[in-house]
Design a protein with these regions (language model features):
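Catalytic alpha-helical scaffold of carbohydrate-active enzymes acting on polysaccharides/glycoconjugates
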Residues: 1-155, 161, 179-251
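Active-site capping/gating regions of soluble enzymes
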Residues: 148, 156-158, 166-173
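A mid-sequence, solvent-exposed acidic-amphipathic segment
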Residues: 167-185
Length: 251
């Protein structure tokens, strides 16, 4: 089972360049990137999970409704928010969509403990790893889903074939033919599932220097990511690897 998910989040602009990029522009980038993802998924009849960054929840009600309308799951993404802010965002999404929000994903450096997450009435926590060129420093340690304080913990997935994580950076940088081999090796092995996550901003061209992206992060953005995602979904379909929303697989 492939658990494909997307972080609905704006690109993180360096502090020295923040005055060059308006909040409206960042929201537009996030909206456009997410809309492109939804369109690609719809063409392939695939349903996924979208984790929306806390600060964007109130600013993008139409997008959240569209995600739900298209049959996808909505979760909360904690980049650096307090417990109160997360609870408020969760409530807004639930009232807006009429759907219970089961899952949360958190940036590693600002992660609330499992008992706090459970207190916020989440059912599962989807882990993520730093998405940069230094992930090679991490020792490969395969983990499976487990419970902690009655909260389902879903670890990030790594390929036993390449020792690379299935994160946004790997999908962006690795040639698709090699990525397919990673998937085949994992799925034909003893992996019950693979969690893959990408970012909405990766589906928008961000070549301007004002966004402060390192050169390797500008590679394959925008239309190239759209095409790559479409070809990847076609590969999954032809290989008969199922894709599902996270809440449907674990509950």
């Amino acid at each position: 089972m492939v658990l494909l998910s997307f972080n609905v989040i704006a690109p993180e602009v360096p502090i020295k360049d923040k005055h060059l990029v308006s909040e409206e522009e960042l929201i537009k980038i996030t909206f456009n990137g997410t809309k492109k993802i939804i369109d690609v998924l719809e063409k392939h009849f695939v349903f996924c999970t979208f984790f929306v960054e806390v600060s964007l929840v109130e600013k993008m009600p139409e997008l959240l409704q569209l995600i739900t309308k298209k049959g996808h799951e909505l979760g909360i993404l904690n980049q650096h928010s307090t417990e109160e802010e997360i609870v408020s965002a969760k409530k807004i999404v639930e009232e807006l969509t009429g759907k219970f929000v089961s899952g949360i994903r958190q940036f590693p450096q600002f992660k609330h403990k499992s008992d706090v997450v459970k207190r916020m009435k989440f059912s599962y926590h989807s882990s993520m790893y730093f998405s940069n060129i230094f992930w090679l420093n991490k020792d490969f340690d395969k983990k499976t889903v487990y419970e902690e304080n009655e909260l389902v913990i879903v670890p990030d997935s790594w390929s036993p074939y390449s020792k690379l994580p299935y994160n946004d950076f790997t999908f962006q940088m690795i040639p698709l033919f090699f990525y397919k081999n990673m998937i085949n090796n994992s799925m034909k092995g003893d992996d019950e599932y693979i969690v893959i996550y990408l970012n909405s901003w990766q589906f928008v061209e961000l070549n301007h220097s004002k966004f402060g992206l390192p050169f390797y992060r500008k590679y394959n953005l925008g239309r190239q990511m759209e095409d790559k995602l479409g070809r990847f979904l076609l590969f999954l379909e032809e290989s008969e690897w199922a894709v599902n929303r996270m809440k449907d697989f674990f509950f």
